[in-house]
Amino acid sequence: MNISVNGQSQVPPGFRFHPTEEELLKYYLRKKISNIKIDLDVIPDIDLNKLEPWDIQEMCKIGTTPQNDWYFYSHKDKKYPTGTRTNRATTVGFWKATGRDKTIYTNGDRIGMRKTLVFYKGRAPHGQKSDWIMHEYRLDESVLISSCGDHDVNVETCDVIGSDEGWVVCRVFKKNNLCKNMISSSPASSVKTPSFNEETIEQLLEVMGQSCKGEIVLDPFLKLPNLECHNNTTITSYQWLIDDQVNNCHVSKVMDPSFITSWAALDRLVASQLNGPNSYSIPAVNETSQSPYHGLNRSGCNTGLTPDYYIPEIDLWNEADFARTTCHLLNGSG
């Protein structure tokens, strides 16, 4: 049934024509070559050499629904009378084959080939490439020969089977339009994404490279920041004790920045030992404040391995430790 009226295709509203490659070959092209009636004939016959891609778009329009691709039958025209090359030149340009032909299979059987062509404006070999692309489908000879056994195939059709001058079915589309429509129809199309050109990307990479070069690997034994101190004499008296404890730790990790940030607290700690008590009560520390003794264990070393603060009541030095500490202090003062 031909649904064209005055050259315009008349189809019901919402009609879409999206045949698969197998359907194009086994149903439409096979019936076209075999002169078998097609139930719904929506593919027109055109002369590819007399029409430009934008003209094909108007002639092959189906209904009023927007289309991304257009289908038509075309008879292959030889470029030279005695040759086998196909003439695909138009008034303003030409169709040039690109890549290898693709084999089309159905149920493991080869049924045809697909050739991809790109439209160039101008004349070869100095044409200007465009966004128009065409897929040209041709039936395999084995499918054509098997069609001769059908009772409704004309004898004249079998006489031309296997020749290179047969019919082909073509699909034409524009690359940019197809990509835009695919993006707009995707679920994530409503999300706005910034557009970057090559120059912008190069600038970003250059900035990222500079920022990476500017990074410095810090020495774990850099000088500690200035401490809050209220008594210079206290610093002089007890600096040797801290240096001795740190040097004996032999740990590779950086000391916690919270390690002894208040000399006044350390002064109270040592004074309590000199005055006699063997234990020192450390105020409870909540999660939002840092203990000045965080990371200080019984040997006075900062291991940096435990994140928990000590409980309020801790025996910092036993009696033997207290005696050794007193001797060190007396010798140092002398």
UniProtKB/Swiss-Prot annotation:
It is found in: Nucleus. Residues 111-181 bind DNA. InterPro entries: NAC-dom, NAC_dom_sf. GO terms for cellular component: nucleus. GO terms for molecular function: DNA-binding transcription factor activity; transcription cis-regulatory region binding. Mostly expressed in anthers. Also present in pollen, base of siliques and inflorescence stems. GO terms for biological process: plant-type secondary cell wall biogenesis; positive regulation of DNA-templated transcription. Keywords: DNA-binding, Nucleus, Transcription, Transcription regulation. PROSITE patterns: NAC (PS51005). PANTHER family: NAC DOMAIN-CONTAINING PROTEIN 43-LIKE (PTHR31744:SF221), PROTEIN CUP-SHAPED COTYLEDON 2-RELATED (PTHR31744). Transcription activator of genes involved in biosynthesis of secondary walls. Together with NST1, required for the secondary cell wall thickening of the anther endocethium, which is necessary for anther dehiscence. May also regulate the secondary cell wall lignification of other tissues such as tracheary elements. The NAC domain includes a DNA-binding domain and a dimerization domain. This is NAC domain-containing protein 66. It comes from Arabidopsis thaliana.
